C-alpha cells in the first residue's frame, strides 16, 4: 500500500568491492536526508591483483558488514525498531557479495518485523539524483561504471526503458584495462584521469567508436585495442608517453560519449517528450572531464545536467536506502525468500526490450 508518511530506511550495499550501509530519511513531501553513509572500500585488498577478486570481496563483506551497519545506525542515532524498512542490493553484482548483503538484510527484517526491500543496484543509481535534487520524472540517465554503460529513460520508480548500452566493454572497465596495460595502479579510472591532465590528447589518432550511428549504443573494445597497439609500439614507455596515451584515450571517450548522448537524448525526446534533466551516475561520473562534457551535452540539448556529488556516484549505502525508501513509499516490498541475482535487467518490466549487439546488455 502506498504511503505519503515519512520513513527511515537502512540501506546495505555489497555488490562489488565496497561494503556500505546508510540510513536515509524520506520525508512526507518526497525529499530526502542522509542521516549516515558509511563506506569501506576494499581497494587495498584487491590492488595486488589489479582488479576485484570475487572470493576476496565476499569474505571481506562477511568480516566487515556487521560493524559497518552498527556504525551507520549509531551515527544516524536510530534504533532498529525505528526503521520503516531494510533495503539491500539484491543484484546485479558479484553473487557472493550480493548474498552476504541480502541475507543480512533478511535477518534484520525478520528479527525486527520490518519490511524488506530488495533493490536493483542499477535502480539505486538511477534514483539517486532524486535524493540530491528536486527532480521530477521523466529524465534521461547516463549510467557509467565498471560493469555498466547505459542510456536509460527514467519514467518513474520501477519504470525504465533502456535506450542504449555498451556492445562490449563497460566504460569503467575500459578505463581500468587501459590503466593496467600502461602500468598504472588499481583502480585505474582515477589514475587515467590524473595522467591525462598533463598529456597531449592530439598526439595519437585514436578512433571514436560508434560515432554517427543511429542507435545510441557504445563500443570501447576497439579503442582499447588501439591504445594497446600504440603502447606496444612505444615500449618502453616514458612518463610522457603514458600521459599522452591517457589523454588521447580519454578524449576519444569524451567525443564518443557526447555523440552517443546526443543521439540518446533525441530518441528520448521523440518517444517521451523533453526530459526534465540529463543525469549521470556510476563511478565514471566522478571523472571531472566527463562531468564537464556532460554539461555541454545537456546545454546543447536544451536541458540541464543534474549529478549527485562524486561520493554518491560510486557505490554506497545511501543510494540503496533511497531506492528502498522510494519503493516503500509506493508500497513495494519483498518477501523474505527473495533470491539474490548476479544479473538483473533494470528494464526487465519491458515486454519487448531494444535489440542489442550481445549478451553484455543483459546486465
Curated annotation (Swiss-Prot):
EC number: 2.3.1.234
Residues reported in the UniProt entry to bind substrate: 143-147, 176, 189, 287
Domain of life: Bacteria
Keyword set, alphabetical order: Acyltransferase, Cytoplasm, Iron, Metal-binding, Transferase, tRNA processing
Cofactor note: Binds 1 Fe(2+) ion per subunit.
Pfam family of the protein (one): TsaD
Molecular function via GO: iron ion binding; N(6)-L-threonylcarbamoyladenine synthase activity
Keyword Ligase among record annotations: no
Subcellular location: Cytoplasm
Binding-site positions, Fe cation: 121, 125, 315
Cellular component terms per the entry's GO annotation: cytoplasm
InterPro entries per the UniProt record, alphabetical: ATPase_NBD, Gcp-like_dom, KAE1/TsaD, TsaD
Cofactor(s) needed by this chain: Fe(2+)
Class of the enzyme per the UniProt entry, highest EC level: transferase
Recorded catalytic activity of this chain's protein: L-threonylcarbamoyladenylate + adenosine(37) in tRNA = N(6)-L-threonylcarbamoyladenosine(37) in tRNA + AMP + H(+)
GO biological process terms on file: tRNA threonylcarbamoyladenosine modification
Protein family (similarity comment): Belongs to the KAE1 / TsaD family.
Protein purpose: Required for the formation of a threonylcarbamoyl group on adenosine at position 37 (t(6)A37) in tRNAs that read codons beginning with adenine. Is involved in the transfer of the threonylcarbamoyl moiety of threonylcarbamoyl-AMP (TC-AMP) to the N6 group of A37, together with TsaE and TsaB. TsaD likely plays a direct catalytic role in this reaction.
The protein, known as: tRNA N6-adenosine threonylcarbamoyltransferase
Amino acid at each position: 500500500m502506498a504511503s505519503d508518511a515519512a520513513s527511515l530506511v537502512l540501506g546495505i550495499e555489497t555488490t562489488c568491492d565496497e561494503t556500505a550501509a546508510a540510513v536515509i530519511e524520506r520525508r512526507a513531501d518526497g525529499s530526502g536526508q542522509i542521516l549516515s553513509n558509511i563506506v569501506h572500500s576494499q581497494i587495498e585488498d584487491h590492488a595486488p591483483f589489479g582488479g576485484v577478486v570475487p572470493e576476496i570481496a565476499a569474505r571481506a563483506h562477511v568480516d566487515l558488514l556487521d560493524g559497518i551497519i552498527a556504525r551507520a545506525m549509531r551515527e544516524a542515532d536510530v534504533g532498529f525498531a525505528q526503521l520503516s524498512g531494510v533495503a539491500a542490493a539484491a543484484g546485479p553484482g558479484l553473487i557472493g557479495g550480493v548474498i552476504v548483503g541480502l541475507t543480512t538484510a533478511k535477518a534484520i527484517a525478520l528479527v525486527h518485523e520490518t519490511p524488506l526491500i530488495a533493490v536493483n543496484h542499477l535502480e539505486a543509481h538511477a534514483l539517486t539524483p532524486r535524493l540530491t535534487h528536486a527532480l521530477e520524472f521523466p529524465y534521461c540517465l547516463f549510467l557509467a561504471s565498471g560493469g555498466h554503460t547505459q542510456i536509460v529513460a527514467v519514467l518513474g520508480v520501477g519504470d525504465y526503458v533502456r535506450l542504449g548500452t555498451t556492445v562490449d566493454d563497460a566504460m569503467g572497465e575500459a578505463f581500468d584495462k587501459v590503466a593496467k596495460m600502461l602500468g598504472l595502479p588499481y583502480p585505474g579510472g582515477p589514475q587515467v584521469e590524473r595522467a591525462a591532465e598533463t598529456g597531449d590528447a592530439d598526439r595519437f589518432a585514436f578512433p571514436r567508436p560508434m560515432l554517427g550511428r543511429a542507435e545510441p549504443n557504445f563500443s570501447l573494445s576497439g579503442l582499447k585495442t588501439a591504445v594497446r597497439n600504440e603502447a606496444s609500439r612505444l615500449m618502453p614507455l616514458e612518463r610522457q608517453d603514458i600521459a599522452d596515451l591517457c589523454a588521447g584515450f580519454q578524449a576519444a571517450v569524451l567525443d564518443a560519449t557526447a555523440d552517443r548522448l546526443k543521439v540518446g537524448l533525441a530518441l528520448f525526446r521523440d518517444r517521451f517528450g523533453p526530459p526534465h534533466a540529463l543525469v549521470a551516475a556510476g563511478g565514471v561520473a566522478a571523472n571531472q572531464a566527463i562531468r564537464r562534457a556532460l554539461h555541454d551535452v545537456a546545454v546543447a540539448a536544451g536541458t540541464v545536467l543534474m549529478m549527485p556529488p562524486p561520493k554518491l556516484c560510486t557505490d554506497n549505502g545511501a543510494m540503496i536506502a533511497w531506492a528502498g525508501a522510494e519503493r516503500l513509499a509506493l508500497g513495494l516490498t519483498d518477501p523474505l525468500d527473495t533470491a539474490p541475482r548476479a544479473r538483473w535487467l533494470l528494464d526487465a518490466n519491458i515486454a519487448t526490450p531494444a535489440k542489442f549487439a550481445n549478451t553484455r546488455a543483459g546486465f
